[in-house]
Amino acid sequence: MSALHYEVHGPSNAAATVLLSSGLGGSAGFWLPQLDALTDAGYRVIAYDQRGTGRSPAALPEAYAIADMARDVIEILDATNTSQCHFAGHALGGLVGLQLALDAPSRIASLALVNAWSKPNPHSARCFDARLALLGACGPRPYVEAQPIFLYPAAWAAENAQRVADEVDHAFAHFPGEANMRARIAALRAFDVDARLADIAAPALIAAARDDTLVPWTCSQRLADGLRDVTLDFMPHGGHAHSVTEAEAFNRSLLDFLSRVSAPAVPA
């Protein structure tokens, strides 16, 4: 058993398992727009709340690192008798996937990296500085009120105002605490595997939105340039959470990638 909360969806006898890892919020619920598409396609799907978030409460140490989060995934894979998975990670979740592909490559059949990065960049650092300053000065409610500004395009957020308001209320009700949030942000800010990208053999889908206001799409291009086996999916719009705002298009791309990397090799 794992101390972390996880959910298993889809057929238990599926030939392949997809594990979904969320971004800074850490909640399995981020992937709701993908669940039906993946299970309908025949995949077994694991989603989880990351340590110190949601239904996986824990006090995180100051030195908490992405490598610790990768070990948590191994714990979940072991608890679910999953020898290998297709790993999909959004932002921070993508960093977890990269770390896992380096530390335990036999557990990773493929990577889908959504608006992720391989090393720090000054624009995202400025965004996190502003968010942490807001958290420290004003508390969690203004912090979560500002979150949609970084996640969604303005037009989409305006058109989905009630949904966004409900998400903000939910995020505030389940806020993991300032100490945990600072530890998680420190972990993602310290992450740098740029010099080791070529060591990762797993095929990777690099998905990004060019209008992401939190993580420049060029960070995904950097991943594509450094990894060995890459499929690119750059969308013109959708924001940092384009797997939510452009779910149908994203799901098509993800399923197409998974069908190719899951297919058995054809004899020559």
Give the predicted meaning of each segment.
Residues 213-219:
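Conserved alpha/beta-hydrolase "acid-adjacent" motif
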Residues 98, 102, 109-138:
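Flexible "cap/lid" loop of the alpha/beta hydrolase fold
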Residues 35, 46-88:
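Active-site loop/oxyanion-hole signature of alpha/beta-hydrolase fold enzymes
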Residues 238-251:
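Catalytic histidine-centered segment of alpha/beta-hydrolase-like enzymes
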Residues 89, 93, 97:
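Gly/Ala-rich beta-loop-alpha elbow adjacent to hydrolase catalytic centers
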Residues 200, 206-208, 212:
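Short beta-strand/loop motif that positions the catalytic acidic residue
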